[in-house]
Amino acid sequence: MKLRSSHNASKTLNANNMETLIECQSEGDIKEHPLLASCESEDSICQLIEVKKRKKVLSWPFLMRRLSPASDFSGALETDLKASLFDQPLSIICGDSDTLPRPIQDILTILCLKGPSTEGIFRRAANEKARKELKEELNSGDAVDLERLPVHLLAVVFKDFLRSIPRKLLSSDLFEEWMGALEMQDEEDRIEALKQVADKLPRPNLLLLKHLVYVLHLISKNSEVNRMDSSNLAICIGPNMLTLENDQSLSFEAQKDLNNKVKTLVEFLIDNCFEIFGENIPVHSSITSDDSLEHTDSSDVSTLQNDSAYDSNDPDVESNSSSGISSPSRQPQVPMATAAGLDSAGPQDAREVSPEPIVSTVARLKSSLAQPDRRYSEPSMPSSQECLESRVTNQTLTKSEGDFPVPRVGSRLESEEAEDPFPEEVFPAVQGKTKRPVDLKIKNLAPGSVLPRALVLKAFSSSSLDASSDSSPVASPSSPKRNFFSRHQSFTTKTEKGKPSREIKKHSMSFTFAPHKKVLTKNLSAGSGKSQDFTRDHVPRGVRKESQLAGRIVQENGCETHNQTARGFCLRPHALSVDDVFQGADWERPGSPPSYEEAMQGPAARLVASESQTVGSMTVGSMRARMLEAHCLLPPLPPAHHVEDSRHRGSKEPLPGHGLSPLPERWKQSRTVHASGDSLGHVSGPGRPELLPLRTVSESVQRNKRDCLVRRCSQPVFEADQFQYAKESYI
């Protein structure tokens, strides 16, 4: 009971009892003990009774024993006494050193760094709960990691801080002087008058005003990104900087007029901050000090620098980038001296010591932030154009005997054997040439090596047989958009499992052998890059050509056996379309293949035999003997009008394709080839070193007496309704 009574007695102290105990009624005692003044203005600390419950507070006698006149304030005690940040005069929270509180410095620094790139800064509202919690933490003096907080939240809390300053930042006592200086007509006179009024502000107010106006100036210069120019900023933050003492008693119209005047004043201060406050802007001590906001100097700046998504759009960065710093953490030594001057002396001394404005320092910081270091954020990837140039450089198309691409030493083709050196996305379709079929892979060869002709023919034949077993569709190489290689190479055909394959009808075995050099090919009939390549070589020379007959990649070889034939023809027979090839074959009976005797006795065969003086017919044994002989040179090209004519026809006439009718039985039994002038190259399938039985038909075309040729074709005669599918080819 006694304990309860004593406890109640201590809780029933009122203001009069406390005044008698501490004996501090005079105004001088209040100045000597700032805690009492802070308690008078801060009701949340001084109240003894809460609405719902009572809070235990320190008794005033205990406080007075600690705050005796004989004892001085220590650093830690002063920090505890000045824990309250809001609703305090700047002269109290700044202290005798005239330095801004640490949280305010940190907030200004973050706003200076992130504000120009944040849309709606100072305009957008923040979460109310987060705002209250942050204010409580700052008021209590707890260490708060401001870097992790949203920029809009910091801007809202900073506006609350300005609103809570007694008599406002621009001082309500100087309201009439501010308005009088603003009403001057001449801009120079207006600036001088505003300078004089600014000098009348208390030193802490002037220090905070300079920092704030410079930050707002930086934000307004980047208004195309943050949508906040000087006018918008003045509307949002102006009423928190200057008001009248009795503004709440004003009418709505008077309040509106007052806000317009304050908005005009703040906007003019933002636009003319250098003319009014000078270019030597004192640097934030938080930027240069080692113990203030180190995360902004190192971790925050380095995170923004390494983040490839961060991009500063401040136009001031480009103008100030010439004096940029090497890294954001290495600051110049002169601003550090400036910060020391701020900590030890007043703003006048700081203006004399600081040789560099804060705008340049911040701009240099942002300039370094605008250059992301991709070593940390993402790998360095060359663009598609760079890949194209590098791969084209590594890929060498030689003019040697085999016409094989020889990769350079150390090139990417040697190390990436399993990788397709010509991906689809690297070679876009340009000027009639598109991507190479995805099934084709280039075999890597040693530099300077040339495969023998027999091995090359075997490789081509093997790839044809493999492709026949896989039955995977491939794009037509005769299309103007499907000729990528101007020179012929060795390919290994592979089937992609992810792509649907189309089953084609079984054709004769003549698909797998190396045909006559004058066999109809899509490259020549379409007038593609192959015929353009030969127009440069008027001198006959041995060459391997890539001929795709019904999708099979085969090797064509010339032969020097019948030089009389080459001399007999004054012009090289140009590439013919499908109609020209089968016109002679269907001369008398369209749609029905001629027999061997009829083809031998046809007018085209007799004409060729009479003019070229070649062998009319050859047996399989004679062809097998002739194909082992030396290869012949190609005859000269036909005139330009023949090439253009065939190209025109080739673009319109379809070639043999997918929809093929079954072969007639008598075609399957035919094993004789009608050859004119040249013999066939040696081919062999996989596991078949010998020549396969040839099943073909002899056909002749009569164009004129100078331009006629008996062509051997591996396809059966098409029906009339099958020519519409003739331009497609499949493997």
UniProtKB/Swiss-Prot annotation:
Gene Ontology molecular function: GTPase activator activity; guanyl-nucleotide exchange factor activity
Parts of the chain that traverse the membrane: none
PTM annotation (Phosphoserine): residues: S400
GO cellular component: cytosol
Xref: InterPro entries: ARHGAP20-like_RhoGAP, Rho_GTPase_activation_prot, RhoGAP_dom
Domain Rho-GAP residue range list: 88-277
Compositional bias segments (type: Basic and acidic residues): 494-503, 641-652
Comp. bias (Polar residues): 299-311, 380-399
Protein name according to UniProt: T-cell activation Rho GTPase-activating protein
